[in-house]
Design a protein with these regions (language model features):
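Basic, Lys/Arg-rich alpha-helical nucleic-acid-recognition elements, primarily the DNA-binding modules
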Residues: 1-87
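Amphipathic alpha-helical interface segments
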Residues: 219-264
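A structural signal for short hydrophobic beta-strand segments in well-ordered beta-sheet cores
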Residues: 59, 212-213
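Primarily the HKD phosphodiesterase
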Residues: 135-190
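HKD-type phospholipase D/PLD-like phosphodiesterase module
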Residues: 177-211
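Amphipathic alpha-helical dimerization/coiled-coil segments
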Residues: 83-134
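Residue-level signal for tight coil/turn positions that link beta-strands
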Residues: 63, 216-217
Length: 264
């Protein structure tokens, strides 16, 4: 009698060793020793799982080198985006599930996996009055700083001035209300900044549904409104290179419907 095979969903997802082996082989065949080192597994523990993958025609092996079959590659091609998306949400479903994501255009929403493993920053009431120190610190180590914001922070005048003096190029997309605040309460500072080649200010034509999204050469900050549209002091920080590309594309998306501000 031919033994009954497991459903493919169980084969792939019911064992972390099998799932990680498939993902590891996604970019090409690997020697068993490399697989063992990468997965921090013993041969005795891993081989039975590899045999199951072979029995289900997902993996093939020869001379201690293993790779995906055509079926295996097809499935892992679909698996990788899902696993990447799960990694983003896995530890922070409460945050992502209670905050507004409508500001993200569809083509970038489908690529949320590119944010990678972010971390949630929970602030005390005292800390909530400060800008995120990680992004401020790393901006001074960056060539440029990109900000999309719909609210005015009282530290903006001093911090933006310091950044420009350190030759950091600033690109800021904001709302008419924020520009009005700059003009009414901080005219001299922002008039001086606008005369600098390093300070680039844009006003967006519509409501953006964003509290703050900012990135430099090192990290991406997402300070989102709640699902009810309220301001929240807690936020996410992402550090993967892919998250910076994602953040840059989001900035370019909003820049398309923004006009440069050359004078207050």
């Amino acid at each position: 009698m031919i033994p009954m095979k497991k459903p493919l969903l169980d084969v792939i997802f019911a064992s972390e060793k099998r799932m990680n082996t498939l993902l590891l082989l996604h970019d090409g065949p690997k020697e068993m020793e490399y697989i063992l080192r990468s997965l921090k597994a013993t041969r005795q523990a891993l081989l039975p799982q590899v045999r199951i993958l072979e029995d289900h025609r997902l993996v093939t092996g020869s001379n201690d080198v293993y790779g995906l079959t055509h079926i295996g590659k097809l499935l892992v091609d679909k698996m990788s985006p899902l696993m990447g998306t799960l990694e983003v949400f896995n530890d922070y479903t409460d945050y992502w599930g209670t905050h507004n994501l409508d500001f993200i255009p569809p083509h970038l929403f489908e690529r949320l996996r590119e944010l990678g493993k972010c971390k949630e920053v929970n602030l005390t009431l005292t800390e909530s009055y400060q800008l995120n120190q990680e992004i401020v610190r790393t901006t001074f180590m960056s060539e440029a700083f990109y900000v999309i914001t719909s609210f005015f922070h009282p530290d903006y005048p001093a911090v933006f001035t310091d950044m420009v003096q350190k030759d950091v190029k600033l690109y800021i997309i904001t709302t008419k209300n924020v520009v009005d605040t700059m003009r009414t309460y901080h005219y001299e500072v922002f008039d001086r900044l606008l005369n600098s080649k390093s300070f680039n200010l844009f006003v967006h034509s519509k409501e953006m549904g964003i509290q703050v999204v900012a990135h430099n050469d090192h990290c991406l900050l997402l300070r989102l409104l709640t699902s009810e549209g309220h301001i929240d002091i807690n936020h996410m920080l992402c550090f993967s290179p892919e998250s910076l590309v994602w953040g840059k594309e989001l900035f370019q998306h909003y820049l398309k419907n923004s006009q440069p501000v050359t004078e207050l």
